[in-house]
Amino acid sequence: MKISNICFSYQPPGESHQEVMERFIRLGVASEELNFDGFYTLEHHFTEFGITGNLYIACANILGRTKRIQVGTMGIVLPTEHPARHVESLLVLDQLSKGRFNYGTVRGLYHKDFRVFGTSQEDSRKTAENFYSMILDASKTGVLHTDGEVVEFPDVNVYPEAYSKKQPTCMTAESSETITYLAERGLPMVLSWIIPVSEKVSQMELYNEVAAEHGHDINNIEHILTFICSVNEDGEKADSVCRNFLENWYDSYKNATNIFNDSNQTRGYDYLKAQWREWVMKGLADPRRRLDYSNELNPVGTPERCIEIIQSNIDATGIKHITVGFEANGSEQEIRESMELFMEKVAPHLKDPQ
């Protein structure tokens, strides 16, 4: 089992940007001190939902302050930057960290990102997949080559050469299209923390079927499960503090994108739009019901309940790497205490899939 920490870098009401960034650094360092296997962060722009806009710089900081843990992105928004810039940043971090950087990617969701950076949101899937393949190929061959579908330029050598023989990487996958793209290439996917186990199982079944058809060893692909976690010996306190955080956090998430508006006609996000409609039909548009749903799915409560939730996900999906976010625990001291309790009373009891 691998257990990593994930930091969203959300700016709660009343906190300054400086406080959020200083906490981000301390949580990264604490992750190594507490024997987590990794520390991951997310890219967002123009919203308090997450204020680490440049993950290459953010990860470089944490890599420079640690010696052992893997530091990764979950993920880099691929369509908003040129693939040559992406691959150079990836290779520099791979060399400087001696292979401790995990290159996690996403296609992007937030309309402001695409508008400001000057790229098409409706073409984001095609662009992300095209760039991702180019970048990973270049990290292996040392040559950045384009097929001309999205961008076109002569082949160029990229520097420095990769440190890692096989680049640690992953991509967040929710729709069948993304899952199929990754499975065809045998690339790892990240599963969402806001869907039930049954849906995660369906995603894994689709992935494994397609990957096997394309000759990949499905037992040798390191997928990642994600969770929001609040662990406390007092289960009611864990539930309450998590709700206080998530109530504002969910509102910030919904307000940062217009994808969920009924009037939005952006193509290419059918899965997320359908998911939101299903939530509305279940009453989950109501903040209280949404928090009930979230806390039921995630390790929120006593150590025993956290073990039960996570282990059931591990056994159902066969995934051996989990990332756990602790920012929903209140103050920085409370976040640290929850991390400590997790590593003391939850992590030792998590087993490989049965």
Swiss-Prot record:
Its EC number is 1.14.14.3. InterPro entries: Alkanal_monooxygenase, Bact_Lucif_Oxidored, Bacterial_luciferase_CS, Luciferase-like_dom, Luciferase-like_sf, Luciferase_bac/NFP. The keyword Membrane does not apply. It catalyses: a long-chain fatty aldehyde + FMNH2 + O2 = a long-chain fatty acid + hnu + FMN + H2O + 2 H(+). Pfam families: Bac_luciferase. GO terms for cellular component: cytosol. Belongs to the bacterial luciferase oxidoreductase family. Light-emitting reaction in luminous bacteria. This is Alkanal monooxygenase alpha chain. The gene is luxA.
